[in-house]
Amino acid sequence: LDCPKCMVEIDGISLIDRQISVLHAESLYDIVMIGGYKAQMLKKFGTKLKINPDYSKTNMLWTLFCAEEELEGDVIVSYGDIVYSREILQELLKSTADISVVIDKGWKSYWQARSEDPLDDAETLKLRADGVIMEIGQLPKTLEEIEGQYIGLMKFSAKGVRQIKQIFRDAVKTSELLGKPLENSYMTDLLQATINKGFLVTSVPICGEWIEVDEVSDMDLQLTHDRLNSIQRSLDS
């Protein structure tokens, strides 16, 4: 790959350009990118840019906290290799919870289109009746353990930001999170540690209308093109 993953183009438009268009449609302009591989290429987007110099040996959570000083007040955190519809973003913005996590209730058809085995690459997600998340990001043994799929999009209130900073700083002291090396931790590890601490992590359920590019095959998938066209149409209307 000769560019950061978020700059990969599908139908002539990069993932990050598509994501920025959706954010701008909801008047969200204060955007911070956190780059690793070939991060200097991200300067052209004109947003604030933070760089994880250790990107090759660290994971998502470490990368997020390379921008720790930017985590203040209400914050939306999004992976760079996804695109979501304006409607999904609107649902997230409506949530009044301190920690709100978008989950796809219709995940199974998307996973089946992308892989022979829908348990491949899927993670556990267990909900309380009121939509509060009890478990996230573990390896599922059965489909029953997956009540939705995390898409990599979430929102934190000022209080929620303080909660995750506390979890991260505590983890820095031991260099571990959930028994794993902190630098290799995933975002879902942070969310699970937050749940374990007794803080509420609330789901924002959606159905479809988002895409993720994990593999080259995702770019060739007809469903990817169909969803991106639909997302673009709703932006243009």
How would you label these PLM feature ranges?
Residues 1-6:
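Short alpha-helical oligomerization interface
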Residues 7, 125-127, 203:
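A structural signal for short hydrophobic beta-strand segments in well-ordered beta-sheet cores
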Residues 9, 13-77, 181:
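Conserved N-terminal catalytic core of the sugar/cofactor nucleotidyltransferase
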Residues 39-42, 85-86, 188:
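Short, well-ordered alpha-helical microsegments
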Residues 44-45, 86-167, 171:
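Conserved core of the sugar-phosphate nucleotidyltransferase
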Residues 55-59, 108-109, 210-212:
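A short acidic, often aromatic-flanked loop/helix-cap motif at beta-alpha or helix-coil junctions
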Residues 80-82:
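The conserved acidic donor/metal-binding loop of glycosyltransferases
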Residues 136-139, 143-237:
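Conserved alpha/beta core of the MobA/IspD/sugar-nucleotide pyrophosphorylase nucleotidyltransferase superfamily
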